[in-house]
């Protein structure tokens, strides 16, 4: 005999199901469940009187040797990813996702993809949202504490360069030369996130570039503070093509060695990652933004200009002066800073993100950007654009799935593809490292509930260790066992070039972390950017700095109020 319950009763027990919508934080965005993998009436839930007990949803006879027996099941989660908004159980084994589907005991339950046995732990995600760990591809490695701050925001991978609080690191995402690269690879052993380092891309002698790739750099950064000349860029791209690594470009703001057209002529048709493509973070003034129309350019934004608010322009001048070691007593330095801050191109940036013309969002950590705000600012932009531009095509009331998939791709799968690590991270898919972020919908985009790193809980909101229950105040982020002992190295990856990997860089430096090679980079094009591959004609008026897409002027209004702000940071 079947049992009937109301939709509210079902949701309170098992979370939302097909057709239900979840509001993301206090934004105007709603995610609607497209598919539910559960068999109604056979949902696996943990707790007193619940179904995950011996002989019920937990199989009493299987052992861990069975490939379908999970080490960890995240039950009844709403998965938001670049290609799906679904309700499912997630099976994790040996630190990797092995299945997305229905968990339980196949002896008594139908359509079981993931077996729960006596060796299985449970994270109850009923009513919660799960996303892939975020990837920040514009990190200045200035301060190792950035890793913890980012982790507590939902970011699990950092890509960039630096050696600490040097002037070179403060201004440029560069880890220069084999000695520094090796020291940073060793330092990464103590970080609770995945990392990859970019070397310095300025040299006419290819040997000076190749030795950095051989040392383990996953790519090269060409930055104007070291000289972003067409010659330097072309030489760096030659080496990148040979070794299948990425080039990240911070182009020539002052147009000293050439204009945007000269840079693109040096690039030819070769792929590169264009940093802060709007230009406030640096790059050809005033028209770097036009590069996003090229099919070989993978464009990203950094978060200080996102979203456009009434404070954005005012705060940027001082940031530029400090970050790039400029002197306020020198008129030319002031002019340099002023040339980068253009409210018209900043106002267009949000719209280009919403149209899928810009493909990624990153931080520019401590070098104008905020390492813990990539995810928050991404969703603030999505909110603002829905507010100003209305629903995207295919979206409707209480269903913003197309916009949600577009925006989540900007800090998950697209950065992973761009830097050749999408085989390992960037989405909730079988075969990938279990870097997973769990959110209470109320706090989505601001404060995760916990972070699973390589299959083990790495960081979580938890109470006083002397409390009688785990929610005793003060509730705050605390390091979990994933950050202790050998787990620090067994749950995170260090990414290196293929040549360094094949030559045994892990053995040469006695690295304990999982070392993996980047791959499949040089054949990329913008068409590979998920949900963010638009290449319209872009123009910038050289006098007014107004931006045009296919001949139509685009802009946005400066926000005076945003979601995901003060109400979440009272304590």
Swiss-Prot record:
Pathway as given in its UniProt record: Nitrogen metabolism; urea degradation; CO(2) and NH(3) from urea (urease route): step 1/1
Residues reported to bind Ni(2+) 1: 138, 140, 221, 364
Catalysis: reaction(s): urea + 2 H2O + H(+) = hydrogencarbonate + 2 NH4(+)
Assembly notes: Heterotrimer of UreA (gamma), UreB (beta) and UreC (alpha) subunits. Three heterotrimers associate to form the active enzyme.
Protein name: Urease subunit alpha
Cofactor binding note from Swiss-Prot or TrEMBL: Binds 2 nickel ions per subunit.
Residues in Urease domain copies: 133-571
Pfam families: Amidohydro_1, Urease_alpha
GO CC terms in record: cytoplasm
Keywords, ordered alphabetically: Cytoplasm, Hydrolase, Metal-binding, Nickel
Binding site for Ni(2+) 2: 221, 250, 276
Top EC class, one word: hydrolase
Subcellular locations according to the entry: Cytoplasm
Residues that, per the record, bind substrate: 223
Active site, renumbered: 324
PTM comment, free text: Carboxylation allows a single lysine to coordinate two nickel ions.
Entries under HAMAP family matching the protein: Urease_alpha (MF_01953)
Cofactors that this protein relies on: Ni cation
Gene Ontology biological-process annotations: urea catabolic process
Coiled coil: none
Annotated positions of the N6-carboxylysine modification: 221
Entry annotated with the keyword Lyase: no
Organism classification: Bacteria, Bacillati, Bacillota, Bacilli, Bacillales
GO molecular function: nickel cation binding; urease activity
